[in-house]
A protein has these predicted regions:
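Alpha-helical transmembrane segments of multipass membrane proteins
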Residues: 103, 107, 177-181, 199-203, ...
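Topogenic membrane-insertion module of multi-pass membrane proteins
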Residues: 71-148, 161-174
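Multi-pass membrane catalytic core of lipid/isoprenoid biosynthesis enzymes
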Residues: 149-194, 240-250, 288-294, 358-373
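C-terminal cap/substrate-recognition subdomain and adjoining C-terminal extension
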Residues: 1-108
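Acidic (Asp/Glu-rich) catalytic motifs at the cytosolic membrane interface
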Residues: 40, 131-159, 214, 255-263, ...
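Membrane-helix interface "capping/anchor" motifs
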Residues: 206-216
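Non-transmembrane, extramembrane segments of multi-pass ion/lipid transporters
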Residues: 55, 64-89, 145-158, 261-275
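C-terminal membrane-associated helical module and adjoining short loops/tails
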Residues: 83-86, 93-95, 206, 224-373
Length: 373
C-alpha cells in the first residue's frame, strides 16, 4: 500500500514538474514563474521540483533571471485612455439632436430672421445640451455595476474603464453647474424649465421608468419641455397647439419603442420586459394606445393649420402646409410598422436621422413649408 501511494505521489509530482516547465517556457522570465511555483509547491515538496521550474527558461532569457518579480496587475492589458470619440460617446452628443426641438418655437413664432433670437436660441441649445450630457454621465455612474454586466452597455467608456469614475464626476459637476448658471443668465424662465427637466429626468432614471405608462408619459413630458425651453429662451408666445401636438406625438413614439421591446421578448419564456412595468400580453394595448395618439397628433396639427396658421397672415399660400401632417403621419405609421416587426433598433428620433425614407419624407415636408412662405 505504501509503495502504491509513493508511486502515485511521484506520478503527480512528475506531472506538476512538466507543467512548471511548460509555464516557465511560455513566461520567459524567472520573475513570472516564481508565483506559480510557490502556488504549486508544498511544504514537503521535492526541492528538485523548485530547481526544475526556476531554471527551465527559454534561450535568451537567462540574462533576465535576476530581474525583480513583476506585480500581478502587469499581466493585464490596461484599457486605453479616453479620446475625443470616447468623450463624444459618453456625453451622448448624438442625443443632442433631440434638443433641436428648442429651435421649433423660433420658426413657428417667425423669429428666424431676427439675429438676437437666433443667438439666444443657439445659446440655449448649447447650455441645455451641457446639462443633459451631465445627466447622462450621472446615470452611467449610478448604473455602472449593471452596465459592466450588460452585453452592449459594457462598451460605454465609463463601464469599459476608458473614463475613470473620478473623471466622470468632475466633468458631470462642471457641465451641470455651468449649464445651470448659463440658464439663469439666459432667462429665469429658461432656468426654471431646465431644473424641472432635470428633476423629472432623475426621477425617471430611479423610479418612473419601471412604471407602465408613467414611463412613456414622462418621456413625452421631457420632449415637450424641450419645446417649452425654446419658447422661454426667445420670450415667444406660448402655443397650446404646439404643446398639445407634442404630447400626443411623442407619446406615440415612446410607446412604439416599448412595443418593440415587448415583441422581442415574446416567445422567450419571459412574462415581462426586464426593468419595465409591461407584460408581453399587453403588446396589443401599447399598439392601440400608440396609434390612437398618432392620429390625435395629426388631428391637432390639421386643426392648427386650418384655424390658426391659414388665417394668421404669416403664409402667402397656407395650402402648402398640408403636406406636412401627411408626411408626418406616413412617417409615424412607418415607425409603428417597424416596431410591430421588431425592427426598430433605436430611439425613433435617432432612427429618423439614419433612415433614408425618413429623410425623403422630411424633404417633402420642408418643401411644402418653403412653398407656403
Amino acid at each position: 500500500m505504501m509503495l502504491r501511494r509513493g508511486s502515485d505521489f511521484k506520478r503527480r509530482r512528475s506531472r506538476q514538474t512538466a507543467g512548471a516547465r511548460r509555464i516557465a517556457r511560455r513566461s520567459g522570465t524567472r520573475g513570472e514563474i516564481e508565483p506559480i511555483v510557490d502556488h504549486l509547491s508544498h511544504p514537503h515538496g521535492d526541492p528538485a521540483f523548485l530547481r526544475e521550474a526556476q531554471t527551465a527558461l527559454p534561450a535568451g532569457a537567462r540574462e533576465q533571471r535576476a530581474s525583480p518579480p513583476r506585480p500581478a496587475d502587469q499581466f493585464f492589458v490596461a484599457p486605453e485612455r479616453a479620446g475625443i470619440a470616447d468623450w463624444a460617446k459618453q456625453l451622448r452628443l448624438h442625443q443632442w439632436a433631440k434638443n433641436g426641438l428648442i429651435f421649433l418655437p423660433l420658426f413657428l413664432a417667425h423669429k428666424f430672421t431676427e439675429p438676437h433670437a437666433i443667438l439666444w436660441a443657439t445659446l440655449g441649445f448649447v447650455v441645455f445640451g451641457c446639462t443633459t450630457s451631465a445627466n447622462y454621465i450621472i446615470n452611467d455612474l449610478v448604473d455602472l455595476k449593471a452596465d459592466r454586466l450588460h452585453p452592449t452597455k459594457r462598451r460605454r467608456p465609463l463601464a469599459a474603464g476608458r473614463i475613470s469614475i473620478a473623471e466622470g464626476i468632475v466633468v458631470a459637476v462642471f457641465l451641470m453647474v455651468g449649464g445651470l448658471v448659463g440658464g439663469v443668465l439666459l432667462s429665469p424662465a429658461f432656468a426654471a424649465a431646465m431644473v424641472a427637466y432635470l428633476g423629472l429626468a432623475i426621477a425617471y432614471s430611479f423610479r418612473l421608468k419601471r412604471l407602465a405608462l408613467a414611463d412613456v408619459f414622462t418621456i413625452t413630458t421631457l420632449f415637450t419641455l424641450r419645446i417649452a425651453l425654446g419658447t422661454a429662451v426667445i420670450d415667444a408666445k406660448w402655443s397650446p397647439w404646439l404643446l398639445s401636438f407634442s404630447m400626443f406625438f411623442f407619446f406615440s413614439l415612446a410607446l412604439a419603442k416599448r412595443n418593440v421591446e415587448l415583441i422581442r421578448v415574446f416567445g422567450s419564456g419571459q412574462r415581462t420586459v426586464s426593468g419595465r412595468g409591461y407584460e408581453i400580453d399587453e403588446a396589443p394595448l401599447t399598439t392601440a394606445f400608440g396609434t390612437a395618439a398618432a392620429v390625435g397628433a395629426m388631428i391637432i396639427m390639421l386643426l392648427y393649420i386650418t384655424n390658426e396658421a391659414a388665417v394668421s397672415g404669416n403664409y402667402r399660400t397656407p395650402a402648402w402646409l398640408f403636406p406636412i401632417p401627411a408626411m408626418m403621419f406616413l412617417w409615424t405609421l412607418r415607425i409603428w410598422l417597424l416596431s410591430y416587426r421588431g425592427l426598430l433598433n433605436d430611439d425613433p428620433v435617432i432612427f429618423a436621422l439614419r433612415d433614408r425614407v425618413s429623410w425623403m419624407l422630411g424633404v417633402v415636408a420642408a418643401l411644402g413649408l418653403a412653398l407656403a412662405f
